[in-house]
Amino acid sequence: MARIAGVDLPRNKRVVVALTYIYGIGEPTAKKICKDAGISEDIRTNDLTPEDQEKLRSEVDKYRVEGDLRREVSLNIKRLVEIGSYRGIRHRRGLPVRGQNTKNNARTRKGSKRK
């Protein structure tokens, strides 16, 4: 089992799909990583050689993923709340941040309706 960026990649999946298990890497980024590392997208994770795994690790290290990315996102939200911007206020109140209507919808964000 390949371990990259602190994440155990699933064994029997294609490398492109397995890389998407890492927070911050989607399918387009995974394809770019495979291309830059010179690894076929169709190869399975359990068929990777140790050299291939090392190539993938070095390519993934060029991106901000997992803990660093989570920390950056949370700090960005914290900054918005501290400066009192509209988006920060919406985060603080637990309401939708990106302009969605809240008259009837947004139950996931607002919580259950009290009777």
UniProtKB/Swiss-Prot annotation:
Pfam family, one: Ribosomal_S13
Keywords: Ribonucleoprotein, Ribosomal protein, RNA-binding, rRNA-binding, tRNA-binding
Matching PROSITE patterns: RIBOSOMAL_S13_1, RIBOSOMAL_S13_2
Region Disordered: start-end pairs: 92-115
GO molecular function: rRNA binding; structural constituent of ribosome; tRNA binding
Domain of life: Bacteria
Disulfide pattern: none
SUPFAM superfamilies: S13-like H2TH domain
Family of the protein in this entry: Belongs to the universal ribosomal protein uS13 family.
Name of the featured protein: Small ribosomal subunit protein uS13
Gene name per UniProt: rpsM
